A protein has these predicted regions:
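A helix-coil-helix interface module used to build multimeric assemblies
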Residues: 1-188
Length: 188
């Protein structure tokens, strides 16, 4: 999930989405160029070539653009057209974070379900309850497990809130302004 292949593969998917959108919006991006990007989106990434390009350019995103462009030469000129680096870096990270949070949520739901089963199974088994770390009165193991589950349910609510409010950063031009896109679209 947090591997280089996942991160840079997501960059490639974002470049395909950008090219597809730019084509639909009338920029000089052809169906053939988009198809070529799509055909090579899952190709193995040549990290040695990326390192060489990065050494020359001193720019990680541009290094990946060049390496991806080598595998789809007809589309090389439209990869990342008009976008800022943050379009791929930040949005890919958000997509990866979302995948991670969804995985955590799935595991958390499993823990809650297991605690519910445990609470039901031990609903009548007595145990000593405590207050302020002092022995107080009898409770059941099942009740105690319900309290643990309640804490996890609160965590689940917060996790759902974060997932629901994790926003894609959109697409901006170079330096985070719209200047490059305004230029590409002749000021419109």
């Amino acid at each position: 999930l947090f591997s280089p292949d996942k991160r840079y593969g997501t960059w490639r998917r974002l470049w395909v989405a950008l090219a597809r959108a730019e084509h639909r919006l009338g920029l000089p991006v052809t169906d053939e160029q988009v198809a070529q990007l799509e055909a090579h989106v899952d190709d193995e990434i040549d990290y040695a070539a990326v390192a060489e390009w990065e050494k020359k350019l001193r720019h990680d995103v541009m290094a990946h653009i060049h390496v991806y462009g080598e595998s789809c030469p007809d589309a090389a000129g439209i990869i990342h057209l008009g976008a800022t680096s943050c379009y791929v870096t930040d949005n890919a990270d958000i997509m990866i974070y979302r995948d991670a949070l969804l995985h955590i949520r799935s595991e958390l739901v499993s823990v809650i379900a297991a605690l519910c089963d445990f609470a039901y199974k031990y609903r009548a088994m007595p145990t000593l309850g405590y207050t302020h770390f002092q022995p107080a009165q009898l409770v059941t193991v099942g009740k105690r497990a319900c309290l643990w589950a309640q804490d996890f349910l609160l965590d689940l609510d917060e996790l759902n809130f974060v997932i629901d409010n994790l926003l894609f950063h959109g697409c901006r031009g170079t330096t985070g302004t719209d200047a490059s896109f305004l230029s590409l679209f002749d000021g419109d």
